[in-house]
Amino acid sequence: MQASQLINSLKFKQVQPALTTDFDVTMLTQDTREVQPGAMFIAVVGYHVDGHDLVDQAIEKGAKIIVASKPLDVNVPVIYVENTERAMAILADVFYGAPSQKMRMIGVTGTNGKTTVTHLIEQIYRDQQQATGLIGTMYRKIKDEKLPTANTTPDAITTQRTLAAMRDAGVETVAMEVSSIALVLGRVWGIDYDIAVFTNLTQDHLDFHKTMAKYTEAKAMLFAQLGNKYSADGTNKVAVLNTDDPVGREFEQYTAAHVLTFGLKPDAMINAQNVEIKSHGTEFDLSVFGHVTHVTMQLIGQFNVYNMLAAFAAAYASGIPEDQIIKSLEKVTGVKGRFQSVPSHTGVSVIVDYSHTPDGLLNALETIQDFATKDIYCVVGCGGDRDKTKRPKMAKIAVEHSTKPIFTSDNPRTEDPTMILNDMVAGVPNADVPVYEDRHVAIAKAIEAAQPGDVVLIAGKGHEDYQIIGRTKHHFDDSEEAAKALALKPTID
């Protein structure tokens, strides 16, 4: 693509020196390791590295034009903008030919449930014989091909490149997790969402947003942009909102799109009544504008009823018949690391769950309480370099809602694991909770002690197959560790 086309896509900018001869831009990147001759290098200020400090490296490797927000002394044209991350999103959308406008885009935001909801949506549309794409915490997926991802919502270039690959592969519908951080940083600018889904909002990411008010504002941005200038047709946009959460009602005021509500309360357009949670699944009556159908799903827990309602509403908004949506949802067995049962012949039930927020942990434990008949073990830790105020809250929830809590490390990152655990212990001063810094030991101890009929919840990491210590990822999989510990116990026929 010609440099002039990219420059013209940015309304407010300065180009120094002025471009006298146009040339072809071969690629966009913010990573000097990726730079190829003819690249446009975008200098982004990151958490640990400032791209402006790497501009000379990028030019040495062949970058022909730079996007920056700080003064530079270089011998190639520089496009100066206020915010390079947001500029990157617009440039990527233009460079890759606005791929989101060629597919049905369903964005899902909220504190908990995004991964499960996007996977449920993907299953529904696959059963409609549609080619699907998925972008989220676990991976990016183009039809059946899975690609690794580093963030819930990748950077704008990666996202637009992925969407372009989906478009070129014939994908018709994309289910995409949209994080609050991505919304604030402008990573999804230029993406033309058709349906935006809100799951819930509870405490998370306050290390980034600082306050719940700012966190709420970040989530609201997804709904405010429905029908924005990027939309080819704003009249068919739909906001799918959980109105059991007061924030859902608030978001109604932020969007000009059509609104479809869901929840357990009967005032929601799509709601669930008579919920019955069992050890092997959940049953309820689904009401869609008053039309009631009994649903039996294999997913367990009230929180999964909300996830199912969100996915149902998103599919319903695009015209898929009720009975076909229900058929798809009833056959889903689960998502890796989301209230995932580890195979066991020991009489001990082991569940691995990604619950890394206070509300997520509470949901998981309350669900277990609905069917547990004996002791509940809860192996839980808190991440380092993240919101410290969650630590005492999660510790308190573990102590109050399980009979055998155990505190351990999660991803300590650059923090001292002992200090993280001390923060947790401080939240339950009157409790005597075993503490094992080594997560492997904590899991092994819990499963070794558990007796037939007991339930062991391993919380916090879910699908992750690594543990971050310092800045290094080490292989670690909660499901694998649980399986090893279970193998050492006697089996029960």
Curated annotation (Swiss-Prot):
Carboxylation is probably crucial for Mg(2+) binding and, consequently, for the gamma-phosphate positioning of ATP. Its cofactor is Mg(2+). Transmembrane segments: none annotated. GO terms for molecular function: ATP binding; magnesium ion binding; UDP-N-acetylmuramoylalanyl-D-glutamate-2,6-diaminopimelate ligase activity. ATP binds at G110, T111, N112, G113, K114, T115, T116. UDP-N-acetyl-alpha-D-muramoyl-L-alanyl-D-glutamate binds at T32, N151, T152, T153, S179, R187. GO terms for cellular component: cytoplasm. Meso-2,6-diaminopimelate binds at R386, D410, N411, P412, R413, G460, E464. It is found in: Cytoplasm. Its main location: cytoplasm. A motif (Meso-diaminopimelate recognition motif) lies at residues 410-413. Pathway: Cell wall biogenesis; peptidoglycan biosynthesis. It catalyses: UDP-N-acetyl-alpha-D-muramoyl-L-alanyl-D-glutamate + meso-2,6-diaminopimelate + ATP = UDP-N-acetyl-alpha-D-muramoyl-L-alanyl-gamma-D-glutamyl-meso-2,6-diaminopimelate + ADP + phosphate + H(+). The modification N6-carboxylysine is found at K219. InterPro entries: Mur-like_cat_sf, Mur_ligase_C, Mur_ligase_C_dom_sf, Mur_ligase_cen, Mur_ligase_N, MurE/MurF_N, UDP-N-AcMur-Glu-dNH2Pim_ligase. Its EC number is 6.3.2.13. One of its GO terms (biological process) is cell division. The keyword Cell wall biogenesis/degradation applies. Belongs to the MurCDEF family. MurE subfamily. Catalyzes the addition of meso-diaminopimelic acid to the nucleotide precursor UDP-N-acetylmuramoyl-L-alanyl-D-glutamate (UMAG) in the biosynthesis of bacterial cell-wall peptidoglycan. PANTHER family: MUR LIGASE FAMILY MEMBER, UDP-N-ACETYLMURAMOYL-L-ALANYL-D-GLUTAMATE--2,6-DIAMINOPIMELATE LIGASE MURE HOMOLOG, CHLOROPLASTIC. NCBIfam families: murE (TIGR01085), PRK00139.1-2 (NF001124), PRK00139.1-4 (NF001126). This is UDP-N-acetylmuramoyl-L-alanyl-D-glutamate--2,6-diaminopimelate ligase. The gene is murE.
